[in-house]
């Protein structure tokens, strides 16, 4: 058993926002470790391209180009997945949005867009996929839900991303509340709080890597392997007893800023 602690062979996974950035890192890790992976993204062309790329890593990666920024979109994605798979072992709620604006001019739409995608969508997508998650779950092999939060929900980022910080702090607490309920159904809910990883959402880490790395105790930004490793841990047998917790993957930033 110890040799299979991190195996995902035979498992079915769905990663939202899986066509790029952190979602793509996680999806790549899952495929490499044997899972059948579905990735969702609103950009159909990019979603299909990423699925084809990741399929070359060894296991199938299937594109589901659906916009999950609304409750209806989340329900549509759930229907599309369940039309293809009778069960779902792993759900990664990764799709997210941010909004940067000064306090005096921060608009209501900057709250609505971010809270809808970052908090409401993870809840309602998990709710819609609950039948498939329950179908896969057993006491010996629970299904997994992994919410991607942020260190900005734990400590304060100097940038004025008010709704983003609030949404990620809220999703961390929602993770705990969902975890207590869903573990009754053999569904284990946890979260990952990434720090600086190169992506379109974190353009500072992408475009100014050395400058950002100098402010990180580990002296580097996160790599694809760092993120994939954290997600594989939580998704596999190794993470079965991690219920409601948030795994911080940030090179020490949270404790230094």
Set out the residue ranges of the language-model regions.
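Short C-terminal tail/terminal secondary-structure segment
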Residues: 2-5, 155, 232, 243-257
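Conserved glycine-rich cofactor-binding loop
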Residues: 19-20, 43
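Short, small/polar-rich loop/turn modules that mediate ligand/substrate recognition or access, typified
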Residues: 183, 188, 242-244
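Residue(s) in the substrate-gating loop at a strand-loop-helix junction
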Residues: 150
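Alpha-helical segment proximal to the catalytic Tyr-Lys
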Residues: 131, 180-181, 240
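Active-site helix of classical SDR
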Residues: 126, 167, 175
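Substrate-binding pocket helix/loop in short-chain dehydrogenase/reductase
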Residues: 102-103, 107-115, 212
